[in-house]
């Protein structure tokens, strides 16, 4: 027999972890975006100092309209995941049905970031690091999704 209290605690822990990691990711992306924009402004002014050509190209490619759109989309998805996970924490506390949406969004952004990494990253080591980080996120979302599914199935059985 499954201990639903353990499932509930496990889901709560996973959801809190998702909130923390997505919040950190959000802050990191915002600071990175600001830094890259400031670097681009300096490059456009001609203040390249002794930066290698590869670094200048990396800054310029990170500030294309497409990459700015992708960054904004990722920030919005991170915000949505955090908001829905906070709502799920309330649902867990009140023994209500848990929403799968933050976990679906997490899966989608994980797959999207792996694909984006292959399309935009030239260094094999950077691609490998991206895959490892996204695999960790993917496993966390999958774990939380499974626990949410177990709790929701139990809640459906109880109400029927």
Please provide the spans of the model-predicted regions.
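Cytosolic juxtamembrane helix and N-cap/initiation of the first transmembrane helix
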Residues: 1-39, 61-65, 159-160
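Membrane-interfacial loop-to-transmembrane-helix junctions in polytopic alpha-helical membrane proteins
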Residues: 3-17, 55-69, 91, 95-98, ...
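Physicochemical signature of membrane-embedded alpha-helices that form the seven-helix bundle of GPCRs
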Residues: 14-24, 66-73, 77, 102-106, ...
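Cytosolic juxtamembrane helix at the C-terminal end of the final transmembrane segment
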Residues: 82-101, 136-160
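Alpha-helical membrane-associated segments of multi-pass integral membrane proteins
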Residues: 105-147
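Perimembrane loop-to-helix junctions flanking transmembrane segments
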Residues: 38-63
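Loop-to-transmembrane helix junctions at the membrane interface
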Residues: 69, 74-114
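Alpha-helical transmembrane segments of multipass membrane proteins
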Residues: 25-28, 32, 77, 81, ...
